[in-house]
Amino acid sequence: MKKFITITLSLMVAMVFLVPQNALAKKPVKIGVLVPLTGIVAQGGLEMKYGIEMAAEEKGTVLGREIKLFVEDTRVKPPVAVTKAEKLVYKDGCKALIGVFSSGVGLALSKNIDKLNVPFLSTHVMTTKFYNLHPLVFRSGQLANDQTAVGNVKGIMARPDLKDRTYYVIVHDYSWGHDAGERFLALAKENGIKVYNNTYDKAPIKTKDWSSYISKIKASGADGVYMAFITNVIPVFAKQAADFGLQDKVKLISAAAPGPLELEAGGKACYGIFGASDWSWDVDNANSNDWEMRFWKKFKTIPSDAAVHSYVGAMNLFNAIEKAGNTDAKAIAAALKGITYDGPYGKVRISAKDNCMRNDAVLTETMAAPENPFGAKVYMKVLETFSAKELGPAE
């Protein structure tokens, strides 16, 4: 009997050491990634996805656990995004949501965040409505509309060839475009910048033929255009404007950074677009230079603003989870407040006051690219750097 008990105990001990490799292994920390992978901004969504994936790979683990990304296509449609978010949280068990390209989608998700009860960090939404929107909603990514407008207006005022012009304002007809237009108009008025149409033009997102708008701009006599178009559309508009001879007389200022692959497709027609943004691969510091080469080696595509600020946003989220010490929603949210990541464009800090990031940014102009490892023919040349304090908002 004693021998039987001894054998039984030995078998039980053996089983304990055989099973735990899987049974007792730490479960991964699941993060839901919401980006547009089909439709008009699919390329921008892909670049965001690349940045987040690169951050997850380089971070490796949080809380000693694997980071597992669950990626869903929002199709830039708010109802679709909300449904996908519910799937990520309720079915997949994601502890945080990250990404989101458009302001409309971001605001729709924010309305449902109490029900979802997980932190949501956008790496691309630019609407000023995100400031202090909800205790679980954060921004660490593309400059907000007010920050972009400040950078663009500072750039205009510092350059006589831009300052002494009359601007025709045209935006995409949805929440982000309206907000971007309003922000520019307010600052233009404060700084004495002439505007032709204070009731700015609103173009449907699906617009492909810009000829009627270009004809109106030419007829107005304006010699500057302030445009708030989705990233991927900017080079399309510029190409058509060049075909109509508009660019010979007009300077283009953009409220969003143009996509690098679209710039390549537009070629010389895309020269001369000014705009404030977080970053371009012309930013020259050791961290930026190293990051862009790592990105290039991994994805074999031109490093983009969308990719880099999504990378930085993801790093802020992952580090906040580490700081929280667990995956509780309120604990992660508390850790996100005031967190800082020192990355390719310097320190990016999420303000504890309003849950939105503050960071330095650059004013760029698109032009022929110098020799570069990416084979790019067009690039965003850095003209000026703005400090986080200059861009605001004040805290």
PLM features per residue range, with description:
Residues I7, M15-A23:
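C-terminal segment of classical bacterial N-terminal signal peptides
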Residues E322-A334:
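Short, charged, surface-exposed loops that flank catalytic or proteolytic processing sites
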Residues T83, T127-K129, L136-F244, D282-D290:
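Extracellular/periplasmic Venus flytrap/periplasmic-binding protein
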Residues V33, L88-F101, L121-T123, T166-V171, ...:
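Periplasmic-binding protein-like
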Residues P28, Q43-Y50, E58-Y131, S140, ...:
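Beta-alpha junction/loop-to-helix N-cap segments that form part of ligand/metal-binding clefts
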Residues V29, T340-E395:
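Solvent-exposed, acidic/polar segments of extracytosolic/periplasmic ligand-binding ectodomains
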Residues Q142, A241-Y311, E322-G325, P370, ...:
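Extracellular/periplasmic periplasmic-binding protein-like sensory domains
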Residues M1-L9:
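Bacterial N-terminal signal peptides that target proteins for export
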